Amino acid sequence: MNDRALQDDVIRALADAPYRASATWRGRELADAGRVERFARFLARHFYHERIVHFFKYSRALARVTARLPEAVLRQPGFDALLSTAVLGERATARAVARLVMAYVAGEAVPYHEDLLRYQEAMMVVEAGPRVWRDTSRGDDRATVAHPPPELVEGTELLELEYDLPTVLPQLLQPWTTPPEAPRRKTSLIVARSRHGRVAVARASDAIASVVRFADGARTVDDLARAAGLRPGEIAATLRDLTEIGAVRFSTGS
């Protein structure tokens, strides 16, 4: 094993608890297992502290009425237990951490808090997962008749909420004495991430939500247009916008 491979192996062990516990890693005997475990857990706490503070910033602002800071979950037994299976940056681990936060800060002090928690969870989970660090693709992804069937990008989430959260989110981060109110009306949001890790949120009309639900890589653009009730120009524009935010891509088949 060369120096680069050795370095990669150590980094993987620090980030991947199941690998750290494997016979493959332990058999290498590269470092004291106890010290590696302690350092790995330190890194995990730092990694998820940053993400919780960032993605659950709205619940953090509401701590004035809930008396629960989201990042305090890092000191709870549930998070300690999770560390034995955690893989830093993986979607499954991000979802598990987000669920711990949701359970910890949940309450009825703010009517729309449940919607808010789901929104923040989606942001944290969608941000996780592998990235494309160097773009080697050629051409563009604009929706044209030459494209194969579009499909939903893995990790994209369609949120159907009871409250219009986008109207209240900026207010939550401003000074207030009583929590700002959110209009109670059905709201659909698409949360998606580009291949390079940029997370975007967009409102979704019923037609756009239909496109997201039915874009499975099997239905053609015409099929999606009929399902959503969109004209050719409208479906092309919709797919172009969804592709731009990373919600949809065009399948190339197998």
Task: Show the residue positions of the predicted features.
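Primary mode marks residue(s) on the alpha4-beta5-alpha5 output face of response regulator receiver
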Residues: P148-P150
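Low-complexity, glycine/alanine/valine/leucine- and proline-rich hydrophobic stretches
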Residues: E154-D216
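Short secondary-structure capping micro-motifs at structural edges
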Residues: R142-A146, P175-T178
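Long, charge-rich, low-complexity alpha-helical segments
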Residues: M1-T144, S194-S254
